[in-house]
Amino acid sequence: MHSLTTHKHVRGGDMTIRTRFAPSPTGLLHVGGARTALFNYLFARHHGGEYLLRIEDTDRARSTPEAVQVILDGLDWLGLSPDQEPVFQSTRETRHTEVAHSLLERGMAYRCFLSPEELQAQRDQAAADKRPLRINSPWRDRDLSEAPSGIAPVIRLRVPQEGETVVDDLVQGPVRVANAELDDMIILRSDGTPTYLHAVVVDDHDMAITHVIRGDDHLTNTFRQVQIFKALGWDLPRFAHIPLIHGADGAKLSKRHGAVSVLEFEREGFLPEALCNYLLRLGWGHGDAEILSRDEQVALFDLDGVGRAASRMDYAKLTHLNGVYLREADDQRLTTDLCRRLDLSPDSDASSRIRRLMPKLKERARTLVDLAESARFVIERPSGPKDAKAAALLSDEARGWLRALLPQLQATDFSAAAVDQALRAFAEEHGLKLGQIAQPLRVALTGGTTSPPIDATLEALGASEVTSRIEAV
């Protein structure tokens, strides 16, 4: 079990800001969760605080080590790894149970012996009355001497029935609910295991969390969790409920809209800094700057810039932004990624050729998948023209020109400048426009009609490879 503090951290007389990202390991890190993690990270960094990770793995059936690793890998890829080792909620069940029993001993909670049949009757009545279900337990005030045999009780919190609960949310503003609308929630199930709502409160307190930043789908939970904090006499954290991410059609984001998990975006060739930049600007505003470095994000981010309306995922805009980041990315870093995607040894000749071409290759690419595809000709000799347009360029006459050109190319040192000069001289000598020789040459070398500039392409491939490819046509 992780040893946790049970007090607010103090530094220089002031409370240290502590945030947490608390996902359930379901097998993927959703892009919405990634944005929540990013906001928690940036808020903590902006205020000189700490950003923690809690894995809410109390659902034993779904919470596998593999599912946990997906979350850890996704956060690591995004550059959002926590400041401390993750806390696993499942290891803290004893603590959760102790706190529940302390509430019971102080009269802030009670044992409830409602049978499954009695509970179902209340559900049926609520449905018939077309009203929200609110469990009314007679055991709130009944004497335990009347308890039936054969029913293992749950423990319910004794929620105030008068007044209202107000959450002064840092994004949504003041949100209130009449306490009469809240039922006495279960904090310990009949099998002795703690409920999610109860465990979260205990963990947030013990981890000294000062700010709970999460999706606004948790807002209704917050009213209930506030009751637990108050019953325990613990300081409340500040709450900030951020809007969810929807698809372009306004519906909840799902696979039908496109990639939804962080590792899908990685596979599809997005850079982590581009995805983070996009997610930050999705629902947070600060001036007109679209591209912000991580340091700039930390310096500028605060919750007052977060909007209340749901954001719509725009994959086209993300792809455009990714292209901007690609063009600014380090060439060796991109080459290393392409070697992985193309199953190349980083020390191979092909890797060196790709590295030389990278400044030109990345000019048109929008994703790393695009980039890898555009570099494929470096490692795979074309089996012929890729399409009809390319085939038309490689006419018998054009093949003759290429054979005539080859000795002139071989006479150069194969630098881009020398290749360019040789091509221009050949075109002028034969009364051709430069494109009339450059385009067939491009098809011969790459199989297609697009590539980096032809002089750079020849320089990267080298004399031997260029000779082999021209002779093959």
Curated annotation (Swiss-Prot):
Entry function:
Catalyzes the attachment of glutamate to tRNA(Glu) in a two-step reaction: glutamate is first activated by ATP to form Glu-AMP and then transferred to the acceptor end of tRNA(Glu).
Q: Provide the reaction this enzyme catalyses.
A: tRNA(Glu) + L-glutamate + ATP = L-glutamyl-tRNA(Glu) + AMP + diphosphate
Q: Gene symbol? A: gltX1
Instruction: Report the protein name in the record.
Output: Glutamate--tRNA ligase 1
Q: Which InterPro entries match?
A: aa-tRNA-synth_I_cd-bd, aa-tRNA-synth_I_codon-bd_sub2, aa-tRNA-synth_I_CS, aa_tRNA-synth_I_cd-bd_sf, Glu-tRNA-ligase_bac/mito, Glu/Gln-tRNA-synth, Glu/Gln-tRNA-synth_Ib_cat-dom, GluQ/Sye
User: What's the source species for this entry?
Assistant: Granulibacter bethesdensis (strain ATCC BAA-1260 / CGDNIH1)
Q: Where is this motif: 'KMSKS' region?
A: 252-256
Taxonomic placement: Bacteria, Pseudomonadati, Pseudomonadota, Alphaproteobacteria, Acetobacterales
What's one Pfam family the UniProt record gives for this protein? Anticodon_2
Which parts form a coiled-coil structure per UniProt? none
Q: Per the record's keyword annotation, is Lipid metabolism included, yes or no? A: no
HAMAP family listed in its UniProt record: Glu_tRNA_synth_type1
Provide this UniProt record's keywords sorted from A to Z: Aminoacyl-tRNA synthetase, ATP-binding, Cytoplasm, Ligase, Nucleotide-binding, Protein biosynthesis
Family membership noted in the UniProt record:
Belongs to the class-I aminoacyl-tRNA synthetase family. Glutamate--tRNA ligase type 1 subfamily.
Would you say which domain of life the source belongs to?
A: Bacteria
| One GO cellular component term noted in the UniProt record for this chain | cytosol
